[in-house]
């Protein structure tokens, strides 16, 4: 039986990351100028995806900027999440998606996002085994972390408008400071 075809879908929205070790899970997202980095350890089958809006980081922690919008924060969270689930850094491999130029009159933040992801992964010694970035259309992405398989669909018309609106909406809400997470 093809476990990928019958997989449980987990959506990753802007400002989030997910780490899984279940071969029946497919991670999915919709990207415009945002970038999703998909990382996995092929030996353990642990993998994950993030979805970030901007490269770099907030200028200062006290500025009130939401760190989950930034690639540097979400890349660190994804890598640390993989390591906590048993992945080894020296075996990690990556695929990068997104970074489209969805609005021609604005600066090309999509290109900056893709360049940031490439540079970050290279600096961390993580091998990039696949990439589909740039262009002027959004993408719908599906990623099977256990196998490393990825599939994307170009978004046009109404779908592209929806992706652009998602890029411009607020990131996932921050957890309440007094909340407790149980493992």
From Swiss-Prot:
Top-level lineage group: Bacteria
Gene3D superfamilies, per database record: 3.30.1330.200
Keyword vocabulary terms for this entry: Chemotaxis, Hydrolase
Keyword Heme appears in the UniProt entry: no
Chain ranges passing through the membrane: none
Catalytic reaction list: L-glutaminyl-[protein] + H2O = L-glutamyl-[protein] + NH4(+)
EC number: 3.5.1.44
CDD domains: CheD
First-level EC class: hydrolase
One GO BP annotation of this record: chemotaxis
Molecular function GO labels: protein-glutamine glutaminase activity
UniProt family annotation: Belongs to the CheD family.
Name of the molecule in the record: Probable chemoreceptor glutamine deamidase CheD
Gene this protein is translated from: cheD
């Amino acid at each position: 039986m093809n476990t990928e075809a019958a997989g449980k879908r987990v959506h990753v929205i802007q400002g989030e990351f997910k780490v899984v070790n279940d071969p029946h899970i497919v991670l999915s997202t919709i990207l415009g100028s945002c970038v999703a980095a998909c990382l996995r350890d092929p030996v353990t089958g642990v993998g994950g995806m993030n979805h970030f809006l901007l490269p770099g980081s907030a200028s200062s922690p006290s500025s009130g900027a939401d760190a989950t919008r930034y690639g540097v924060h979400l890349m660190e969270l994804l890598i640390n999440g993989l390591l906590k689930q048993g992945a080894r850094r020296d075996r990690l491999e990556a695929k990068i998606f997104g970074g489209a130029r969805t609005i021609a009159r604005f600066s090309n933040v999509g290109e900056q996002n893709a360049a940031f992801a490439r540079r970050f992964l290279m600096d961390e010694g993580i091998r990039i085994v696949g990439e589909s970035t740039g262009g002027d259309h959004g993408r719908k992405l599906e990623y099977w972390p256990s196998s490393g398989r990825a599939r994307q669909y170009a978004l046009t018309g109404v779908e592209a408008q929806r992706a652009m609106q998602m890029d411009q909406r607020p990131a996932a809400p921050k957890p309440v400071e007094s909340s407790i997470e149980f493992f």
